[in-house]
Structure formats: C-alpha cells, structure tokens
Amino acid sequence: MRFAAAHALCLILGGLTVAAGGDSNSPWHGHGPGAGDECTLVAKGHGIDDAPQLLHAWQKCSTISIPAHTTLNIATRLNMTGGRDKHIDLKGALRFNPDIPYWTANGFPFTFQTQITFWILGGENIVLDGGGLLDGAGQAWYDAFAANASLLRPIIMTLYQATNVLVQDIHMLNSPEWNNFVNEGKNVTFSNINIQTFSTSKNFFANTDGWDIYRSDTVTIKDSIINNGDDCVSFKPNSTNIVVSNLNCNGSHGISVGSLGQFPGVFDIVENVTSTNIQMSNAQNGARIKAWAGPNVGSGIVKNITFENFSELAVDNPVVIDQCYETNATECAAFPSNTYIQDILFKNIAGTGTSTKVASLACSPDGRCSNVQVDNFSLSSPAGAAVYACQNVNLTGNAASLFGACTVT
Ligand SMILES: *[C@@H]1O[C@H](CO)[C@@H](O)[C@H](O)[C@H]1NC(C)=O
Ligand SMILES: *[C@@H]1O[C@H](CO)[C@@H](O)[C@H](O)[C@H]1NC(C)=O
Ligand SMILES: *[C@@H]1O[C@H](CO)[C@@H](O)[C@H](O)[C@H]1NC(C)=O
Ligand SMILES: *[C@@H]1O[C@H](CO)[C@@H](O)[C@H](O)[C@H]1NC(C)=O
Ligand SMILES: *[C@@H]1O[C@H](CO)[C@@H](O)[C@H](O)[C@H]1NC(C)=O
Ligand SMILES: *[C@@H]1O[C@H](CO)[C@@H](O)[C@H](O)[C@H]1NC(C)=O
Ligand SMILES: *[C@@H]1O[C@H](CO)[C@@H](O)[C@H](O)[C@H]1NC(C)=O
Ligand SMILES: *[C@@H]1O[C@H](CO)[C@@H](O)[C@H](O)[C@H]1NC(C)=O
Ligand SMILES: *[C@@H]1O[C@H](CO)[C@@H](O)[C@H](O)[C@H]1NC(C)=O
Ligand SMILES: *[C@@H]1O[C@H](CO)[C@@H](O)[C@H](O)[C@H]1NC(C)=O
Ligand SMILES: *[C@@H]1O[C@H](CO)[C@@H](O)[C@H](O)[C@H]1NC(C)=O
C-alpha cells in the first residue's frame, strides 16, 4: 500500500525522455520512478510518519521535492547514506517528531563524543537546498535534558561519508543537540544556512553547536547566520583544508579548534583552517584553539590556522589558545601537551570583551607552540584597561607588543 501511495505522489517532470522512467516491466503504472525522475512528496498528515516515503523517494528518485507549505513528519530515523547524484529540493519542512524514548533508543549512534543523530546523509554528488526548514522540535528535548543530564539528544543532520555535497539556503530550527555534523566527508559546502535556537521555558538549549567537523577534508562554510548555545563552528580531530567565511554568530561558544589530543594513543590533526569575516556577538569565546595536556592524554598537530577579520561584541574570551586544557599549571608543566601548535595567525581582531582580559595565548611549557603571529588587534573592555596574557610562546606581529613579555612556566 505504501508503494502505491508513494508512486502516486511521484510526478514526472514535463519533457522527460522515456529513457528516464517508464520501464514496461516495472510494477508501476505509467512512469515509475527511475533515474532522472522527480518525486514530489506530500505529507500524509494525521500524525503518520513520513520517513518511509522520504526514504523510498531517496532510493528511487534523483530529485526529491518537498514543496512549500508541506511539513513532513519524521518519526523514525533516516538512513540516507550511499546516495549518488541526488537533489533534495526542500521548500517545505522536515520536522523531527520529539518522541524521546524512540530516538534515544534508535538514533544512529556515533562513538565520537557519544552522539546520536536523526539523520545520516551520505554518498556522492548530493545537493540539499530550496530555502526550506529542518525543524529539530528541540523544546521537549531542552526540558527533558534539564531533568536528565545524561540524556542523549539527536543531531539534526549528519553528513556521513559524504563527498561533493552542497547544502545551501536551508533554515535550521531548535536542534536538540548539534545542528550539523560532518563526519568522514570530503568536499562539502554549506552556504546561506540560517540556524536559530531558542527556548520558551527556563531550560537552556545546551550543546547546540552550529557545525562540528571530524575526519573530513575540504569543507567550506559561508554566508550564514547562527544563533545558538554552544560552538558556532568546531574543528574536531582530523579536520583539514577548511574555509569558514562570512558568518554572523550570536550567543555561541565561538569558533574553536579542538579540543584536541584528548585520547591516549590517538593522533589528532587540524591543518589548513581559515576563518574569516566573522561577526561574533554575546559569545563565550571568539577565536579559540584548545589542546589537552596532562598525564594520560593523546597527541596531535594544529598547523596553519588563520583567524582573520573578527568583529567581536561582548565576547568573554575574544582570543584564546589553551594548550593546558583541563590541567592546572603544575600538571601542565610536568606533562606538557603533545598536541603541537604551529603557524597560527590572528589578524584584524576588533571589538569588545566582557572582562578586562581580552586575549589569552597560553601554551604548554617546552616550546609546544611555534610561529604564532598576532596582527592588528583592536580590542577593548567595558570593565577597564584591556589585558593581554601569554605564556610559553614567542609572539610575532604588530600586536605582539600589546602582550609584552610572556610568562614562562
Ligand atoms: C544504512 O543503510 C545502508 C544500506 O543502505 C547500510 O549498509 C548501513 O549499514 C546503514 N547504516 C546504519 C548506521 O544503519
Ligand atoms: C537519562 O538519559 C539516558 C540516556 O539517554 C537514559 O539511558 C536514562 O534512562 C535517562 N534517565 C531517565 C531517568 O529518564
Ligand atoms: C566539490 O563539490 C561540488 C558540489 O558542491 C562540485 O561542484 C565540485 O565539482 C566538487 N569538486 C571536486 C574537485 O570534485
Ligand atoms: C543573541 O544572543 C543573546 C545571548 O545569548 C540573546 O539574548 C539574544 O536574544 C540573541 N539575539 C538574537 C538576535 O537572536
Ligand atoms: C588522523 O589522521 C592520522 C593520519 O592519517 C591518523 O593516524 C589518526 O588516527 C587520525 N585520527 C583520528 C582521530 O581519526
Ligand atoms: C595544507 O595545505 C598545503 C598547501 O596547500 C598542502 O601542501 C598540504 O598538503 C595541506 N595539508 C593537508 C593536511 O591537507
Ligand atoms: C593554509 O590553509 C589555507 C586553507 O585554510 C590554504 O589556503 C593555504 O594554502 C595553507 N597554507 C599553507 C602554507 O599550507
Ligand atoms: C579582511 O578584511 C580586509 C579589509 O576589509 C580585506 O581587505 C581582506 O581581504 C579580508 N581578508 C579576508 C581573508 O577575507
Ligand atoms: C593539580 O592537579 C593534580 C591532578 O589533578 C592534583 O593532584 C593537584 O593537587 C593539583 N594542584 C593544584 C595546585 O591544584
Ligand atoms: C586593522 O583593523 C581595522 C579594523 O579594526 C581595519 O580597518 C584596518 O584596515 C586593519 N589594518 C590592516 C593593516 O589590516
Ligand atoms: C623564544 O625564543 C627564545 C630565543 O630564540 C628561545 O630561547 C625560547 O626557547 C623561545 N621560547 C619558546 C616558548 O618558544
């Protein structure tokens, strides 16, 4: 029955040649869905789960259209991996039904940071666009998390083993957890994404990162607006060749490399990352790099990272390197970080902090940071004269004089 219903909703594009569909041996009447077909989905309504028809269209159609004013009710998980030459034209919405017991038991799990997700999307040559909405229906999750701090909450969209992907002109609302996870991706672009997160109760929308990049190469994130409650963009282990530009981040924890080097025996690489033209407002951090130190941690390399053209407004820590992450001074001196940091540029960083300390570049002892350049800083604080702190690093650049001599531990 579901097949027949799904078929009835698959409209063949005018002008399509017969080669694209209409196999005479197919079980379909007339044109069955085949390569080149466009399928248009209509919500079943009455609380019926639309995930099966969306999955069916993903298997059978090259273009999947969700028209304006159509909200698909996604009540079961979406495994949309291994696709090829797919276009999801989302003008309407996908709303992820907040059935907490269902998702905590059935969300796709990832060992990395113990995450789960509603949706894995992967394969090759995939476009998701159309101006529509991914609605995480997060309020129920924010309220449940307030009562259960170990509650697993689903990421809206995980690009998993995805190559040559474009996500553009998409709104994301109230994710229960991270908004976008790029896991083992290559050549992925996000453009014109509008992320909004808010709570109508007293409970906060925790861990709602904009993007987390992991084991991925060649990722671009640009021209987007993010209003959330955790990292705006986070470069996790093995993020390489990344450009982030023209973002307006509000209320976040900033743009962050790391934390890296946490797990013994694991080597983390973050290399070739540029973040530029960033408006960062009401945030915990602006531009940040953090790496673990201590006795039982991992190792890695952070190399060629540029933070350029940051305009910051009311940011608690506008510029940060913390290479003694989660350790105190004694322990960091005994066990300096094995995640080396080199070739770092902070350039054209302007705006306001919230406390007097507007920059803190704290490296582990024993020369674990090298070639750190600071240029053209223009930061002030409403709390008094701006303080620039540095430790165990030789800074270069025209803003180095603001820092003066760095502490050696
Ligand atoms: C998703 O579906 C593919 C087959 O289509 C399967 O190989 C894969 O294991 C599934 N992934 C998960 C996480 O269930
Ligand atoms: C809290 O969440 C965890 C993880 O999702 C779950 O295993 C546990 O049962 C929940 N606890 C309660 C009291 O609901
Ligand atoms: C990268 O992906 C885009 C689609 O976003 C595609 O147009 C482009 O050809 C891909 N680049 C390479 C080198 O494959
Ligand atoms: C920006 O973030 C602040 C602090 O989190 C919040 O109070 C404010 O409403 C946000 N502004 C917008 C435009 O969303
Ligand atoms: C990162 O890449 C390196 C080199 O390929 C590899 O040895 C390491 O295990 C990777 N780390 C992670 C966290 O995947
Ligand atoms: C970083 O970029 C340089 C210059 O393009 C390139 O040679 C190097 O291979 C890149 N590193 C990684 C890890 O991709
Ligand atoms: C540094 O990374 C950027 C990408 O973020 C890349 O364009 C540039 O070539 C890299 N430079 C070096 C010296 O590797
Ligand atoms: C930073 O801003 C300056 C001045 O607006 C501009 O010339 C430069 O191209 C920008 N840098 C990047 C990497 O966008
Ligand atoms: C530093 O941390 C270590 C390990 O947690 C702890 O044993 C030690 O007491 C701490 N020292 C200070 C000065 O807080
Ligand atoms: C320094 O930053 C200011 C904005 O804070 C900008 O107008 C100016 O062009 C920058 N100077 C250089 C040399 O990049
Ligand atoms: C800073 O430079 C001096 C002189 O070259 C060198 O002795 C010292 O080890 C360097 N410090 C760090 C933290 O790299």
Which residues does each predicted region cover?
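Extracellular/periplasmic carbohydrate-active domains that bind, remodel
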Residues: 2-409
